Amino acid sequence: MRNCCRERGFSVGRLEPETSFSCASDVKSSPDMDSVSSQDSLYLPNSIGASLEDQNLWTQFHQEGTEMIITKSGRRMFPQCKIRLFGLHPYTKYMLLVDFVPLDNFRYKWNKNQWEAAGKAEPHPPCRTYVHPDSPASGAHWMKDPICFQKLKLTNNTLDQQGHIILHSMHRYKPRFHVVQSDDMYNSPWGLVQVFSFPETEFTAVTAYQNEKITKLKINHNPFAKGFREQERSHKRDDVLKTLQQSPSKSQKRKKWEDSPEADISDFPKATRIKEESIMDPAGVYQNWVSDHEANQGLTPHSPESEGVNQEQQVPTSSSNFYIKSQYRRSSQHLSSPYDLGEPSSRRLTPDVATVPDSDPDSLAVLHVIPTQNSAQERTCSMNFSMETPMKQPLRGAIYSPYGTEQWMVPAQGPYQPVSYTAYPTDLSAQGAVAHPHSGMSDWSQYSLFPYSCW
């Protein structure tokens, strides 16, 4: 009998049974139990049993094909593995362990709303066993409350060092629960070994849910999946709509702001800057500084000089002003430089002119101007007439002076007449006479041109 029990016994080193058991009646006894007295007959191995908690929930998942997510960092199971034990000795120490074994040697795939075999299974990784954190504990402790393996995690990382259960994706597995009699996990020998498994806990390991029904079941029953529920989504959607109605979006705010008068006021300085930059055109800034020939080539059609709508003509107010400008023109011909044309428009001199009604253009003489290269100030002072364009003939009058031409006449110089000087003039009222001891040019011959100190 002992040899038979040893052959059917559980290998503690590998934690891999030769035969599987799915009910509490299928147990394996240890030879040490033969010494148990008759008073402890109530705690014999065949009296130990286990039941699955949340069996109805597991049954719903099992009917649709349970799927469990596996990740590299590890993912907890749902539904959780939770069992209840009974028939244990209340003062004996026990350990509780869980491992996962493949159901078959096939790899599966999801096709047309069902699972089907897709080939041979991959080599199974080294078997790992998860030990319940309360191990070892007395039988009374294990039978007091349901035993939950909530901290158990599944992973597909074959190099995991966190103690998680290593599984292959698209493979089917089932958990097994082991009850071991031992006072110490490492030193004392393991005695009684009892194994339990439940068909409702079979599942397929996946990295993403394939069956939509399984997804809905997990959303509806998992307390940690409240954020994925459709009811919660509808509430959040309603809240978002309410917030959008209370506070418009940025685009709507911007549209309203652009339509408001504040936007026009804020854009006004920008338009002013653009207008000022457009004035910096050379033809517009120096329009009064160019000659008639240059004006015909570069004058813009919107230039003030090309418009003849003004019925008044600028004329000098005094002849002296024109005379001074003419003198300045003669003296500045040799002083002009290329830098004169680069002066800003703010330094232009505005001539002192007055506006008078324009006369008949047919009776006015046309004044022909010879283009000269003068400075900016010269052109501003000397050119007081409007310029013509090739396509438009403006109305203009001749520049004239309100005074006669006699003021410009200079008396002719006669032959040179020597002026005599008297040493002692008697007429003190004479103007222009200078007293000098010598009366004529011949009297200067007795003096040398240079003093003797220069010899």
UniProtKB/Swiss-Prot annotation:
Tissue spec. comment: Maternally localized to the vegetal hemisphere of oocytes. Zygotic expression parallels blastopore formation and shifts from dorsal expression in the marginal zone of late blastula and early gastrula stages to a ventral/lateral expression at later stages. During neurula and tailbud stages, expressed in the posterior and anterior ends of the embryo. During tailbud stages, expressed in a subset of interneurons in the neural tube.
Main location: nucleus
Chain intervals for the UniProt region annotation (Disordered): 229-276, 295-350
The entry's keywords: Developmental protein, DNA-binding, Nucleus, Transcription, Transcription regulation
DNA-binding region location: 57-230
Sequence ranges of Basic and acidic residues compositional bias: 229-241
SMART domains linked to this entry: TBOX (SM00425)
GO molecular function: DNA-binding transcription factor activity, RNA polymerase II-specific; RNA polymerase II cis-regulatory region sequence-specific DNA binding
Keyword Transcription: yes
GO terms under biological process: cell fate specification; positive regulation of DNA-templated transcription; regulation of transcription by RNA polymerase II
Stimuli inducing this protein: By mesoderm-inducers including t/bra, and both FGF and TGF-beta family members. FGF signaling is not required for initial expression in the dorsal marginal zone, but is required for its continued expression during mid to late gastrula stages.
Listed Polar residues bias regions: 308-326
Annotated SUPFAM superfamilies: p53-like transcription factors
Name of a matching Pfam family: T-box
GO cellular component, one term: chromatin
Domain of life: Eukaryota
Subcellular location: Nucleus
Listed InterPro entries: p53-like_TF_DNA-bd_sf (IPR008967), T-box_DNA-bd (IPR046360), T-box_sf (IPR036960), TF_T-box (IPR001699), TF_T-box_CS (IPR018186)
Protein function: Transcription factor required for both mesoderm and endoderm formation in the embryo; signaling determinants and concentration levels may determine which germ layer is formed. Acts together with beta-catenin to activate genes that are responsible for mesoderm induction including wnt-8, eomes t/bra, siamois, mix1 and sox17. Directly binds to promoter DNA. Patterns the mesoderm along the dorsoventral and posterior axis. Activates siamois gene transcription when alone or in combination with beta-catenin, but inhibits siamois transcription in combination with pou5f1.1/oct-25.
Subunit structure, as described in the record: Forms a repression complex on the promoters of the nodal/nr1 and siamois genes with the maternal factors tcf7l1/tcf3 and pouf5.1/oct-25. Interacts (via C-terminus) with tcf7l1/tcf3 (via N-terminus). Also interacts with the other POU-domain transcription factors pou5f1.2/oct-91 and pou5f1.3/oct-60.
PANTHER family: MGA, MAX DIMERIZATION PROTEIN, T-BOX PROTEIN-RELATED
Designated name of the protein: T-box protein VegT-B
